[in-house]
Amino acid sequence: MPNVRLTLAYDGTAYHGFQKQSGSGLPTIQETLERCLAELSGAALKVTGASRTDAGVHARGQVVNFVTGRWGIPTERIPAALNGVLPGDIAALDAREVPADFHARYSAVAKTYSYTLYNHPVRSPFQRLYSLHVPRALDLRAMRLAARHLMGRHDFSTFQAAGRPVQSAVRTLTRADIEAQAPLVRLVFRADGFLYNMVRIMAGTLLEVGLERLDPEALPDIIASGDRARAGPTVPPHGLCLEEVEYDST
C-alpha cells in the first residue's frame, strides 16, 4: 500500500496544536486533515506529522505521511483534491509516494523554524496573530552576537521546557540568523532536532539580549549551566512558524 508524503501550510490560530487530542472535541490540524482524507478516501487514515506544533503555531512546510489503499486519486492530484475539502486556513502543497519505511518525524534530518517580532512603538492589528509586538527598539547587533553562541553542537537543556522528557538534550544548531526588514525581525533557527519549546525559549533569550537585559557574552555560560531559570522567557506561540523539514532522499 502506498506511503504518501504530504507537505502542508497552515495558520495555527484556530487550532489546539497539530496532534489529535482524543475525546477533547478540540480542533487540531491532525484531526482536521484525517477527517478530510476520510471524506476523500472513504477510509480512516492515520496521519503522522514531522512536528507536533503547539496551539497557535503556524507552518509553511509541515510534512506528514500516511499509508493509503488505491483510492482512485493519483498521488500528484492529492493536494488539489484535499484543498477542495480542507478549511481555508490549511493548504496541501505537495504529495509524493515514498518508501514504506519513510516516517515524517523519524526520517527528518533537519528542521527550520522562524520566530517573528514586530518591532515598532505601535502594535499592528494585521501582525498580531503572526508576530510578537515589541515596542522598544532592539539592539540587533547584540542579538546577532548572542545567536552565534547558540550555533554548533550543545546540550540544550537550558532551553528545554518541562513536560516531554528525552534521552539526550544534545542537538546541533546549524543556523541562528537575525533577519531584519523593519518593522519585522525574524529569528531563524535550523537544527537536526529541537527540544520542547526550545525555539521559543531561544527566541525569548535573544529578545532579552536585544532589550539590553542580558549580556550577549553570557550565552556560553547559560548554555553550559543546563539551568532553565538562566535563560529568557518562553515567548508566546503565535510568532512561531515551522518553515521547512528536510530529508536525505525523499
From Swiss-Prot:
| Superkingdom of origin organism | Bacteria
Q: In the UniProt entry, which residues are flagged as the active site?
A: 54
The membrane-spanning stretches of this chain are none
Q: Name one GO molecular function term.
A: RNA binding
Q: Which reaction does it catalyse?
A: uridine(38/39/40) in tRNA = pseudouridine(38/39/40) in tRNA
Alphabetically sorted, this entry's keywords are: Isomerase, tRNA processing
Query: Which InterPro entries does the record cross-reference, listed alphabetically?
Result: PsdUridine_synth_cat_dom_sf, PsdUridine_synth_TruA, PsdUridine_synth_TruA_a/b_dom, PsdUridine_synth_TruA_C, TruA/RsuA/RluB/E/F_N
Enzyme class name: isomerase
Tell me which Gene Ontology terms the entry assigns under biological process: tRNA pseudouridine synthesis
* E.C. number: 5.4.99.12
Q: For substrate, which residues are the binding ones?
A: 113
Cited SUPFAM superfamilies: Pseudouridine synthase
Which PANTHER family does the entry link to? PSEUDOURIDYLATE SYNTHASE, TRNA PSEUDOURIDINE SYNTHASE-LIKE 1
**Subunit-structure text:** Homodimer.
Functionally, this protein is described as follows: Formation of pseudouridine at positions 38, 39 and 40 in the anticodon stem and loop of transfer RNAs.
Name the family: Belongs to the tRNA pseudouridine synthase TruA family.
Question: HAMAP family, per this entry?
Answer: TruA
State the protein's name: tRNA pseudouridine synthase A
Q: Which organism is it from?
A: Desulforudis audaxviator (strain MP104C)
Gene name of the encoded protein:
truA
